[in-house]
């Protein structure tokens, strides 16, 4: 139906014209969609309904319900029935999923406290029976991020086969079982033969899907990595791609394009399914999920940049240009413990580099500064258009603080470049003050957002890979030039005062980057000052 909708053109009145032809169209990957598997505030019921309709519109057919903070999905209440109000919501989700040709997959996460007894393994099946009565016909068992007895691969395989034999096969109308293993990425997997992954491969019924995040927790999906795990689990792995999830970088938005996914011959055969773990911001996640839908339907024909921009146009038809400017500069996670980064500010980055290189040498390249100033002006102008025309109140609730900060970054950048170009020291100083005021406004937005009464609070970072660092460096360069001219004395550079055994990377304390930091793991000692 979605293919017909895409082919149809409006005729007069209520009519639609379809071209004459033969449609040959099918997906490269059987199961395509998302896993709500992030740490943080789970999506709201309304957000999930919106997601399911979005999946149907874009040919995704899988939604795996596995929010880490749902106590009835995980410990301590995975054995217990949902309260009546939550059960009613799940029943509605199943209904809407079916209307949109989406499998609602309910996942259980028992591994934190499961007892490997017949009684407790039966408790998993009993919970599935409860969910079956709510209309659920697709199920998953997660053993990720656990310790202790729950990690045993032999017992996990025993439980999964028991569920498969006594529940899935008996019901007749239940889709193949999905499991997320404890060793769900190559970096955490025991490479020795006969260990965890090999046990699953040897003992699990071949119909059971095994999930996999890649060569590490957050990583591109490569054919070589797929082949490595598939040899061990003896089936095509079911990809759980940790993008655009931000539970490890909450200050940033990942609204960039989908790339870094295998597309060479053999790629589609290496995947039994492909789901994305999105952000806790469901509306903002749709930008990247649109690209995932395109990739998983037609891997060889996937064009990353085109899909990204087409997604923005479809999601925000009245604010597409402004939103594209915004997502251009809000796509990277920033430094993080997983070491997974995304490109950001790609088109303007060469200009930024040339401007900074010249400025460090006391030079100005007028052509480049004009281009950079124009981009900062586009950033400042995009924010009010997004507020007025995005036509998505839920989105603005999710990213409103980032849009506000983005506008201030645009103002700060314009003033910083103008200060660099200014020959009059006092005029340059005025521009510099205006730039720092805009940066201070950004800091205020971030602080207020980080103090809001929510469980998972975060700072707000925008343009953090290229544009914000550029403004900070330009402001520093201008200040070193301007203030000595006004004060009649050399400018002083800040230096760290503490010394001792924990000075490694102490230069981050005064590097001018508001996103970096230094901390000492040692107490101050006599003589450290």
Q: What residue spans do the PLM features occupy?
A:
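Short, solvent-exposed loop/turn elements at domain surfaces
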Residues: 41-45, 220, 284, 506-508, ...
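Conserved beta-strand positions in the central sheet of alpha/beta enzyme cores
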Residues: 64, 140-142, 275
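Short polar catalytic/cofactor-binding loops
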Residues: 38-41, 185, 501-504
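C-terminal functional modules
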Residues: 304-487
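Catalytic-core regions of glycoside hydrolase
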Residues: 12, 37-38, 75-76, 80-81, ...
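Feature activates predominantly on carbohydrate-active enzymes
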Residues: 1-127, 133-137, 169
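Disordered, acidic Ser/Thr/Pro-rich linker "stalks" and the adjacent N-terminal cap
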Residues: 480-529
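Short, histidine-centered active-site or binding-site loop motifs used for metal coordination
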Residues: 108-110, 143-145, 243
């Amino acid at each position: 139906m979605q293919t017909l909708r895409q082919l149809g053109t409006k005729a007069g009145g209520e009519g639609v014209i379809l071209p004459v032809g033969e449609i040959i169209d099918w997906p490269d990957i059987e199961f395509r969609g998302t896993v709500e598997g992030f740490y943080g505030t789970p999506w709201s019921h309304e957000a999930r309904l919106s997601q399911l309709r979005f999946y149907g519109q874009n040919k995704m057919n899988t939604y795996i319900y596995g929010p880490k903070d749902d106590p009835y999905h995980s410990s301590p209440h995975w054995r217990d029935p949902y309260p009546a109000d939550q059960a009613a919501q799940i029943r509605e989700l199943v209904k809407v999923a079916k209307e949109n040709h989406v499998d609602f997959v309910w996942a259980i996460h028992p591994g934190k406290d499961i007892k490997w007894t017949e009684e407790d393994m039966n408790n998993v099946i009993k919970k599935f029976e409860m969910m079956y009565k709510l209309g659920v016909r697709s199920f998953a068992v997660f053993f990720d991020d656990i310790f202790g007895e729950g990690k045993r691969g032999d017992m996990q395989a025993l439980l999964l086969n028991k569920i498969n034999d006594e529940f899935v096969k008996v019901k007749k109308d239940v889709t193949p079982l999905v499991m997320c293993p404890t060793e769900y990425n190559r970096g955490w997997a025991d490479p020795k033969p006969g260990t965890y992954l090999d046990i699953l491969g040897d003992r699990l019924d071949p119909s059971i899907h095994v999930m996999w995040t890649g060569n590490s927790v957050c990583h591109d999906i490569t054919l070589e990595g797929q082949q490595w795990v598939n040899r061990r689990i003896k089936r095509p792995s079911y990809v759980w791609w940790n993008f655009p999830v931000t539970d490890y970088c909450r200050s940033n938005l990942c609204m960039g394009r989908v790339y870094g996914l295998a597309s060479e011959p053999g790629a589609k055969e290496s995947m039994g399914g492909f789901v994305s773990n999105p952000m806790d911001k469901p509306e903002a996640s749709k930008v990247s999920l649109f690209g995932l839908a395109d990739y998983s339907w037609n891997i060889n024909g996937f064009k990353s940049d085109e899909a990204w921009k087409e997604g923005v146009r479809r999601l925000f038809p009245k604010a597409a240009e402004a939103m594209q400017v915004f997502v251009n500069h809000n796509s990277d996670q920033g430094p993080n413990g997983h070491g997974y980064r995304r490109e950001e500010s790609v088109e303007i980055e060469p200009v930024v580099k040339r401007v900074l290189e010249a400025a460090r040498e006391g030079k100005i390249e007028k052509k480049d500064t004009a281009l950079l100033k124009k981009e900062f002006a586009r950033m400042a102008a995009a924010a009010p258009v997004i507020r007025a025309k995005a036509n998505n109140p839920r989105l603005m609730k999710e990213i409103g603080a980032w849009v506000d900060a983005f506008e201030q970054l645009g103002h700060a950048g314009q003033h910083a470049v103008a200060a660099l170009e200014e020959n009059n020291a006092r005029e340059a100083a005025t521009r510099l003050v205006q730039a720092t005021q805009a940066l201070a406004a950004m800091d205020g937005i971030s602080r207020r957002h980080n103090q809001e009464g929510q469980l998972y609070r975060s700072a707000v970072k925008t343009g953090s890979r290229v544009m914000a660092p550029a403004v900070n460096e330009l402001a520093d360069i201008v200040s070193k030039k301007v203030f000595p001219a006004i004060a009649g004395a050399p400018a002083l550079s800040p230096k760290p005062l503490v010394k001792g055994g924990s000075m490694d990377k102490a230069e981050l304390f005064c590097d001018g980057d508001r996103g970096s930091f230094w901390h000492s793991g040692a107490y101050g000692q006599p003589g450290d000052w």
